[in-house]
């Protein structure tokens, strides 16, 4: 009998075990689509980014003009740029929904997968930040100045660290050059981490909405989840193309259409929308080092979630108190996002401080307490 190449060839076997014959729970919902959507986002960003890099010039005198030239004179350059800029937004929408799914259904109990995922989030944030600097508009320049300056809050080595990152005494040509190099490199680091993420995931298998073992009822990934993922791809890419064609600048800052000028500070420096919640937490603490620590903690707190799981049930499906807290946390993050886009004045300062306090309280205190209470109420 002839060997089945798909199951015996060294390389095809890996693909087969990950995408075709992978045993998957029979009841995973659309919330499990976002992992594959993130993969498509990554591929889209690498392809469009590579095409943009072919026309971009990483020099302070030419960067802004090279981006304008791309949009005017390169075949479909405007489309490639708009897909790349808005693709970043979709990347973050998908990753936040993916993390939300993980928190709700207790997927963080696959500790290795979860920890690699948090590292992936941090790498993605770094990539998006250095990428935003490249067009060398006003918000690019001032965003780079403000955020890199935060490292100067680190005691003793802070100022040296910042000047080392800048390659001089201010954000200038060396900074832009190294940011371009990093922006080119980091997506490939993300690809590597994604493979590690998947390797750990396939050790344990996927979680499911009930949060119970699903070994007794598994179905092959292909054709069931391949077709389901393709539907997700079509829907997300349709939305991305629609945004890029109809309203490409909806999520951008008009300030970035002005070339960078170190002598003119924009009236309100703010990052892209997907960083606003963390920016609001940073701003809500009146001390520089305290703000930087809170900013770091807002993401690093995700590493603690597996340790703070006190419930005897994995998922929140049967835990109404935790559900209320979860949706309060979601609303809270949306409030932080809105506050981050507002000027630093009353009442936004106090709203931001309350929302920041609530963010950490829900994750670090209320989630474990509610879960322990539910154990009692459900007599577990």
From Swiss-Prot:
It holds the Pfam family Cytochrome_B. The keyword Nucleotidyltransferase does not apply. Binds 2 heme b groups non-covalently. The keyword Iron-sulfur does not apply. It is found in: Mitochondrion inner membrane. Keywords: Electron transport, Heme, Iron, Membrane, Metal-binding, Mitochondrion, Mitochondrion inner membrane, Respiratory chain, Transmembrane, Transmembrane helix, Transport, Ubiquinone. Gene3D superfamilies: Cytochrome Bc1 Complex, Chain C. One of its GO terms (biological process) is mitochondrial electron transport, ubiquinol to cytochrome c. GO terms for molecular function: metal ion binding; ubiquinol-cytochrome-c reductase activity. A ubiquinone binds at residue 202. It comes from the Eukaryota. Heme b b566 binds at residues 98, 197. Heme b b562 binds at residues 84, 183. Heme 1 (or BL or b562) is low-potential and absorbs at about 562 nm, and heme 2 (or BH or b566) is high-potential and absorbs at about 566 nm. PANTHER family: CYTOCHROME B. The cytochrome bc1 complex contains 11 subunits: 3 respiratory subunits (MT-CYB, CYC1 and UQCRFS1), 2 core proteins (UQCRC1 and UQCRC2) and 6 low-molecular weight proteins (UQCRH/QCR6, UQCRB/QCR7, UQCRQ/QCR8, UQCR10/QCR9, UQCR11/QCR10 and a cleavage product of UQCRFS1). This cytochrome bc1 complex then forms a dimer. Belongs to the cytochrome b family. This is Cytochrome b. It comes from Oreothlypis gutturalis.
């Amino acid at each position: 009998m002839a060997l089945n190449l798909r199951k015996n060839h060294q390389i095809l076997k890996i693909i087969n075990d990950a995408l075709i014959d992978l045993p998957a729970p029979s009841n995973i919902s659309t919330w499990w689509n976002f992992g594959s959507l993130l993969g498509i986002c990554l591929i889209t960003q690498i392809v469009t980014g590579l095409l943009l890099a072919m026309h971009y010039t990483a020099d302070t005198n030419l960067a802004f003009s090279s981006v304008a030239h791309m949009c005017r004179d390169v075949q479909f350059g405007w489309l490639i740029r708009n897909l790349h800029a808005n693709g970043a937004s979709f990347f973050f929408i998908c990753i936040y929904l993916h993390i939300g799914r993980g928190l709700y259904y207790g997927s963080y109990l696959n500790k290795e997968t979860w920890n690699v995922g948090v590292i992936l989030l941090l790498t993605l944030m770094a990539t998006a930040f250095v990428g935003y600097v490249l067009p060398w508009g006003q918000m690019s320049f001032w965003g780079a100045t403000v955020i890199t300056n935060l490292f100067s809050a680190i005691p003793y080595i802070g100022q040296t660290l910042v000047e080392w990152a800048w390659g001089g005494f201010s954000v200038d040509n060396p900074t832009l050059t190294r940011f371009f190099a990093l922006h080119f490199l980091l997506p490939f680091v993300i690809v590597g981490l994604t493979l590690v993420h998947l390797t750990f995931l396939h050790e344990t298998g996927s979680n499911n909405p009930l949060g119970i073992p699903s070994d007794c009822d598994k179905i092959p990934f292909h054709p069931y989840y391949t077709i389901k993922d393709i539907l997700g791809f079509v829907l997300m890419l349709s939305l991305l193309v629609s945004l890029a064609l109809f309203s490409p600048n909806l999520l951008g800052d008009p300030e970035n259409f002005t070339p960078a000028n170190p002598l003119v500070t924009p009236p309100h420096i703010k990052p892209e929308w997907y960083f606003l919640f963390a920016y609001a937490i940073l701003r809500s603490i009146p001390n520089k080092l305290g703000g930087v620590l809170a900013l770091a903690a807002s993401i690093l707190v995700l590493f603690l979630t597996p340790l703070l799981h006190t419930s005897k049930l994995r998922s929140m499906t049967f835990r109404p108190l935790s559900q209320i807290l979860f949706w309060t946390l979601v609303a809270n993050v949306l409030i932080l996002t809105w506050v981050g886009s507002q000027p630093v004045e009353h009442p936004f300062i106090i709203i931001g401080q309350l929302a920041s306090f609530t963010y950490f309280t829900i994750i670090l205190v209320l989630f474990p307490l509610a879960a322990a209470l539910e154990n009692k109420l459900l007599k577990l």
